[in-house]
UniProtKB/Swiss-Prot annotation:
GO terms for molecular function: ATP binding; metal ion binding; NAD binding; NAD+ kinase activity. Signal peptide: none annotated. Coiled coil: none annotated. It is found in: Cytoplasm. GO terms for biological process: NAD metabolic process; NADP biosynthetic process. Belongs to the NAD kinase family. This is NAD kinase. Its main location: cytoplasm. NAD(+) binds at D74, G75, N148, E149, H159, R176, D178, T189, A190, Y191, S192, L193, S194, Q249. It comes from Vibrio vulnificus (strain CMCP6). It comes from the Bacteria.
């Protein structure tokens, strides 16, 4: 029987010795099973027992690998997703972080779960990303992608900004607020949730717009069709600097009068899970929801 995966990438920037050991254990275990294994080159100075030719950058890993195993928390997954979504690479996560909504394998027992996945017993789902573009004087000045959210916010803490929101070129509303969170369903359990946004099922083709501390009593989160194009027109009277933050990891500078275009990316993250994965079990477990009554 043909194996579903032949080349496997191990990705992640570890913060502690336990995570480093997980990378090392994964590499030697997968190699012993006959897989061709490559590791994120950010670990080349740490994993000195791995041959130098087995390290590659994220883009090269996306080009080579059938499967990428991301070790760490959701931050590592977000950073990898923006690159790996460009390629036909399936992705699974081993949780070495905190909540771990995206990295769901237990690091103490990853071999048992991964054995079944490597044999083809897994659930696959596609998660869409957002593209964020900063337009100035009719030109795109900068752009990036986000798996969770793109956030317009001031460069200063506790500093309001003014902007208008358009959906498919149709004016929707204006805001005087600390900013706006534009979230995917994947990101609805992240920063958007902290801001009072709704939890969206990950398979839903929708985008949520969540105002951050709006200076009005009537402002509420808004969910729109995922194929809509969001345009934020930043007031030319705003003072100071503003930014668009993609997944809290990449910042795009924004000037007064700029336009911000946010829309669904054509790229998809091919996220896989063990067969017993349940999104609602994850929500219940991570968010501390009540158990069954009977």
């Amino acid at each position: 029987m043909k194996k579903p995966f032949n080349v496997i990438a191990i990705i992640g920037k570890p913060r502690d010795q336990q995570a480093i050991q997980t990378h090392r254990d994964l590499y030697h275990w997968l190699s012993s099973l006959g897989y061709q294994v490559f590791i994120d080159d950010r670990l080349s100075a740490i994993l000195n027992d791995v041959p130098e030719e087995h390290f590659s950058g994220l883009v090269e890993l996306g080009e080579k690998a059938d499967l990428a195993i991301v070790v760490g928390g959701d931050g590592n997954m977000l950073g990898a997703a923006r690159i790996l979504s460009r390629f036909n690479t399936r992705v699974i996560g081993v949780n070495r972080g905190n909540l771990g909504f995206l990295t769901d394998l237990n690091p103490e027992d990853f071999q048992h779960s991964l054995e079944a996945v490597l044999d083809g017993a897994y659930i696959e789902e596609e998660r869409f990303l957002l593209e964020a573009e900063i337009h100035r004087h009719g030109q795109v000045k900068s752009h990036n992608a986000a798996l969770n959210e793109a956030v317009l916010h001031p460069g200063q803490v506790a500093h309001m900004i003014e902007f208008e929101v358009y959906i498919d070129e149709s004016f929707a509303f204006s805001l005087r607020a600390d900013g706006l969170i534009v979230s995917t369903p994947t990101g609805s359990t992240a920063y958007s949730l902290s801001g009072g946004g709704p939890i969206l099922s990950p398979s839903l083709n929708a985008i949520s717009l969540v105002p951050m501390f709006p200076h009005t009593l009537s402002s509420r989160p808004l969910v729109v069709d995922g194929n809509r194009r969001i345009k934020l027109l930043v007031s030319p009277d705003n003072r100071g600097t503003q930014e668009v933050s993609c997944d809290g990891q990449v910042s795009l500078p924004v000037s007064p009068g700029d336009e911000i275009h946010i829309y669904q990316s054509p790229n998809r993250l091919r996220l896989i899970h063990p067969k017993d994965y349940s999104y609602y079990h994850v929500l219940r477990n991570k968010l501390g929801w009540s158990s069954k009554l009977f």
